[in-house]
Amino acid sequence: MLDKEENIIKSNNSTSSNEKQHVDVTVESLENGDDFEEREIRDKAYKILKGHIDEAITPEESKRVRRKIDWRILPLITLVYGMNYVDKAALSWAVMFNLRKDINIDGNQYSWVSAIFYFGYLGAEYPANFIIHKFSVSKIICVVCLVWGVLLFGHLGVKNYAGLMVIRFILGVSEAPISAACINYIGEWYTKDEQPFRFLCFASGQGGLYIIFSLVAYGLGHVNDGSLYSWQYIFLVLACLSIILGTYMWFFLPTLPSEAKFLTEHERLIATKRVAGNMTGIKTIYWDNKQIIEAIKDPKTYFLVLYMFFSMIPNGGLTNFNTLVLSSFNFSKYETILVNLPWSFFSAGQMWVWAFFGIYFKNLRILGLTIPMIIAMIGLAIVYGTENGNADKWGRVFAYWMINSCSASFPYAMNMTGQLISGHTKQSFTNSAVLIAFAVGNIVGPFCFNASDAPKYTHALATIMGCFAACIVIGAGLGIYILWENKRRNKLYGNPEEDESLKLEGIIEGLKDKTDTENHHFRYVY
């Protein structure tokens, strides 16, 4: 299935004589002139690209190198991103096995326990993105995974509400870098056309690992040896696995394409040239405050932030309360865990469907932001509308599973920041804003579920319905805006997809750390 992605990659072998002349002039100005343009280039990858910018790479070379990259980094990123989700979901399993009773917390206190994680996440998000901008993304991913493991061990010592609040807050701080780090990391290794498939692959790891660890939690829930509570065993297993994974990645997760030891010198050049074509650069540590001002003025920032906020209100509520909502269908606590397994199939399965179509069709991103929300809205409408009726129990359960279709849009929402925004400072700032919206939405979500509404949580479901509708409108609005902007740029500056010299100019502007507004040859994907 990966091989067929080459239908997307365009060969750069043929250029017109005029285009070639323009290319030579550009390269000459970088290498043999007064080095004025070279001094403007901030990207760390330029060292390996110097002298090779105008050299074409064949689709066969690109495919061969991409395969090696896939096998090396995708399994590790999928595992770490899946563990990131399971760490949060573990709280809902722990509640099923009497966490609330054992440490004496009530329903409203549990809402605060769910939300406090995202207060830590919120406070740490901007510093986390600054650190990602300055340091090796791969090492940051390894370190935060190790820290998760230590903090999950800390859950075993929790004796009361205050202790749980403290450990969940610190866990939120430690997880703040992971989403932005994964976005940046994939952007450092893959072309724009390849990124959505990879995002969907590793994001599906959340659903996949959720299914696996739901079964693990089911088994651990039957352990009653007296040394630990059942819910403590869940945190113990996850802690050990997080530390093992973080340690392994420290040695085997590569940094940048230009520094990858598992590639030959020529393959490192190919890997770097592939990503340079994104016109976003690869790695720049220079911080430019002017780009922050531009991000604040950019309408795309507000589309992305609002979409993330409204999509995370359902996520924040359902991640922590889904087992409680499902138990209102009159299942036992063990049945609830098993019946909840298809909940993840509806997200992970849809991600793979979108990934499959993404191989054959370009520009599915806006559809990926809206269609999963429509499916989720239909499922929620059925659950909400049959609440007091005599509808078939399993029909309602199926509709409930449909609600998690909304999770299939999350990889697209995260990926859009890296693909619509150029300029490393602007991208870091926008990532921070989007992930702050992620945290705020997840904070708001649990408070939609009031204890007085249990077990059906009617008002919470109505709120979530409104959030799904808002996401559909915002996603469609973003698509209309970027289509209009692309047409405007093509009219004013020409189409870089039809003129190789314009495309090369755009690549060089990206290496200079120009923003998407400054780089007139940058085109938005949709």
Where would I find each of the regions flagged by the language model?
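Intracellular terminal tails of multi-pass secondary transporters
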Residues: 1-83, 107, 250-285, 371, ...
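Extracytoplasmic
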Residues: 72-107, 123, 128, 178, ...
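Extracytoplasmic gate region of multi-pass secondary transporters
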Residues: 92, 290-355, 410, 414, ...
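Conserved MFS/SLC helix-loop-helix module at the cytosolic interface between two early adjacent transmembrane helices
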Residues: 122-162
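Helix-to-loop junctions at the C-terminal end of transmembrane segments
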Residues: 123-136, 349-364
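Structural signature of the two symmetry-related core transmembrane helices
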Residues: 139-153, 367-382
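Short hydrophobic/alpha-helical segments at membrane-entry points of transmembrane helices
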Residues: 160-168, 180, 230, 303-304, ...
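Glycine-rich segments within core transmembrane alpha-helices of 12-TM secondary carriers
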Residues: 196-228, 236-242, 431-445
